[in-house]
Amino acid sequence: MAEEEEAKTEANGQQQAPQMRVLGQFIRDMSFENIMAQKGAPSDAQPDVQVQVNLDAKKRTADNQYESAIKLNVTSKVKDGDATLFVLELDYVGIFHVDNVPDEQLHPFLLIECPRMIFPFLRRIVSDITRDGGFPPLNLENIDFLSLYRNELARRQSSEAPKMDA
């Protein structure tokens, strides 16, 4: 019965709703450096945590399959100094099967919706790694992937804009 409705929808020329399935997710690359332990210094200092997020997506060889990656760099320094407490670099990837997304909407879909699906798992990994590294668990705030995407588009457009000579 559902197949008949899909056939009717296609026959009427209406577009089907976008569909996405997570086929897998994995850590492509990870590095955690506990600088304080290497230096033998006490880790009771007040931390200043800086988080950088980069996104990447690419098509896989299979039909309608894509990779969406969140690249996270976390640096924690002593609040009142230059000493680094720890550095965490994590490249977390999701593999997705995507159907019924128009080509002009595919790029934002892969860089907004797909990262949104895998982010809770990345957050847990970051929390576990920092805790296991001897620090309080770092609980990342939610990331607004739409704003991140828009900011990146604006940055690219401003860097491509012709410069005016005064």
Curated annotation (Swiss-Prot):
Gene giving rise to this polypeptide: secB
Protein name: Protein-export protein SecB
Biological classification of the source: Bacteria, Pseudomonadati, Pseudomonadota, Alphaproteobacteria, Rhodobacterales
Keyword Signal: no
The protein's assembly and partners: Homotetramer, a dimer of dimers. One homotetramer interacts with 1 SecA dimer.
Primary location class: cytoplasm
Subcellular location, record wording: Cytoplasm
GO molecular function: unfolded protein binding
Cellular component GO terms, alphabetical: cytoplasm
Alphabetically ordered keywords of this record: Chaperone, Cytoplasm, Protein transport, Translocation, Transport
Native organism: Roseobacter denitrificans (strain ATCC 33942 / OCh 114) (Erythrobacter sp. (strain OCh 114))
Task performed by this protein: One of the proteins required for the normal export of preproteins out of the cell cytoplasm. It is a molecular chaperone that binds to a subset of precursor proteins, maintaining them in a translocation-competent state. It also specifically binds to its receptor SecA.
Pfam families: SecB
GO biological process, one term: protein folding
Domain of life of the source: Bacteria
Family per similarity comment: Belongs to the SecB family.
